[in-house]
Amino acid sequence: MRLSTVLLGSLLGALTQAAPTGQFPGHYQSSPPPLGPSNWERNPVSVFFKVLNTQPDPDYTMLKELVTYDCTYVSLTFDNPTLHSIMPWAGTHTNIGPQAFIDIFTRVGLYWDRGPFTIDYIFGDGGNVTAWGSFTATSRTLGKTVISPWAARARVNEDNRIFYFQWMEDTFTTASSFGSDASNKTYVSNPQGGTTVA
């Protein structure tokens, strides 16, 4: 059994068996939502989990509850003007609070059509929490689809609110979804010699 299964199982509690198909209109099987407002324990890992899962449809009310007003969000890099020119949300958003999450999550959705997003592992040590997984995204400008690993970490205060958030991904891959076929670049990385065109 994977660590994430064990952690999420203890985080969410026991899931009830799906109701018989005849109990619902249309005969669709259903089960209670795993993180409803009345059945989740607020702790650093569960807060982090909820924030990660609001990316496709940012919930400002929830983010105001789970993120401090002066939270700092580091997106992809501390400061990289070239990357920022491709993905304008890249960089350090110091003391912007929940609005940084809304701005970044919304803008990502404007630039990419989001595909599957997985949280493979999530765990914490007190107020320090981390998670990683993968996501698929298709650029809305060129229709290029990429798959990237991601990793995130957060620091959570004693009130179980995030005051520092950092998101990393394979920016070489994700930025390439916006590159035209003619936009090759030559790299000289090997000290033994040679170049790579990508």
Swiss-Prot record:
Encoding gene per record: patF
Reaction(s) the record says it catalyses: phyllostine = neopatulin
Family to which this protein belongs: Belongs to the patF family.
Protein name per its UniProtKB record: Patulin synthesis protein F
Cell compartments where the protein resides: Cytoplasm, Cytosol
Function recorded in the entry: Part of the gene cluster that mediates the biosynthesis of patulin, an acetate-derived tetraketide mycotoxin produced by several fungal species that shows antimicrobial properties against several bacteria. PatF catalyzes the conversion of phyllostine into neopatulin. The pathway begins with the synthesis of 6-methylsalicylic acid by the polyketide synthase (PKS) patK via condensation of acetate and malonate units. The 6-methylsalicylic acid decarboxylase patG then catalyzes the decarboxylation of 6-methylsalicylic acid to yield m-cresol (also known as 3-methylphenol).
Glycosylation sites: N128, N184
Biotechnology (record note): Patulin was originally used as an antibiotic and specifically trialed to be used against the common cold, but it is no longer used for that purpose since it has been shown to induce immunological, neurological and gastrointestinal effects. Genotoxic effects of patulin with dose-dependent increase in DNA strand breaks in brain, liver and kidneys have been detected in mice. However, more recently, it has been proposed that patulin might also have anti-tumor properties.
Organism: Aspergillus clavatus (strain ATCC 1007 / CBS 513.65 / DSM 816 / NCTC 3887 / NRRL 1 / QM 1276 / 107)
InterPro entries reported in the protein's UniProt record: NTF2-like_dom_sf
Gene Ontology, cellular component aspect: cytosol
Domain of life: Eukaryota
Alphabetical list of SUPFAM superfamilies matching this protein: NTF2-like
Taxonomic lineage of the native organism: Eukaryota, Fungi, Dikarya, Ascomycota, Pezizomycotina
Pathway: Mycotoxin biosynthesis; patulin biosynthesis
EC nos: 1.-.-.-
